[in-house]
Swiss-Prot record:
One of its GO terms (biological process) is lipid A biosynthetic process. NCBIfam families: lpxB. This is Lipid-A-disaccharide synthase. The gene is lpxB. It comes from Azotobacter vinelandii (strain DJ / ATCC BAA-1303). Pfam families: LpxB (PF02684). It catalyses: a lipid X + a UDP-2-N,3-O-bis[(3R)-3-hydroxyacyl]-alpha-D-glucosamine = a lipid A disaccharide + UDP + H(+). One of its GO terms (molecular function) is lipid-A-disaccharide synthase activity. The keyword Lipid biosynthesis applies.
Amino acid sequence: MAGVLRVALVAGEASGDILGASLMQALKAVRPDIEFIGVGGPRMQAEGLQSYFPMERLAVMGLFEVLGRLPELLLRRRWLIRDLLEARPDLYIGIDAPDFNLGIELRLRRAGIRTVHYVSPSVWAWRQKRVLKIRQACDLMLTLFPFEAEFYEARNVPVRFVGHPLADQIPLQTDRDAARAALDLTDGETIVALLPGSRGGELARLGPLFIEAAERLLALHAGPLRFVVPCASPERRRQLEEMLSHTRRDLPVMLLDGRSHEALAACDAVLIASGTATLEALLYKRPMVVAYRLAPLTYKVARHLVKTPFFSLPNLLAGRALVPELLQDRATPEALAEALIPLLEIGGEQTECFDAIHRSLRRDASRRAAESVLELAERA
């Protein structure tokens, strides 16, 4: 393909901004004559993206939480389709945000523009009929996990498993002692990391639960014990400080500003909200208990739609019940503490499997994704 390659990318939240920026770097390494348009955050803009509007306008979560923003989202998507049809990029890459991106991909593909979707929606878990729209909308699906690629291959959707960028970034072996020294943690203490979520709503549901579980674990565990809690933002720190003000004053807990990777590297075990953070804990080879509580109405709907036996990424990747996972009413302080106790003594079965999974995901994901994108562009 001669001349400047124009690529449109749209990301809807911070994780997509990170993936998009890394992909843009890999594309520029092969094709310096490339131009980026679309929607992205500060990282993608730093790589040269001309963003049509702030990415934060697309960041919304939950089945019912989205309803209040739906008119704006639909309007912005309509504007974006209009602008992209006028700009005629050589290729469109929708990064995650499937409910927003797939509609754009469908319109652009019908207009003769090649389309890629990067990061599979959880179509293998629920709303499986979405695969029909994906087949119509996408020239290529790029997946982070191997079981996703198997799902699409069985349904005749063009797909490439590229691996996960986090598996490339996090080393196969990490230095626990160095991480503890960096956090000024005392030698000889057992360290448990608490990661109750980065969003306000999930922290409101899980924060008090995790704190009460920590209190119960303190009573059950023999020997010195300390908890570390990374705070995703100043707002989340204030939220946690308010929760801790209502608990016992001698609870040995340290709040961190960010530094979640250091907390994972330093700890002996993790109590963690379901989500991407469970993959990070897996890559750091730390035994974990996974918990989650949804908004009641969301859970009432979701429990009838989900088709998989597990909800946590480690179990989905292992294909078995490798880590304890407790959802909704099963996630009680007593149950969480009791599930953590044995992991403080012997968590080896989990961590051996974690190492094998890490190696399977470590594939230089951004380079592979860039190669796949450029192969598709050359066919255009």
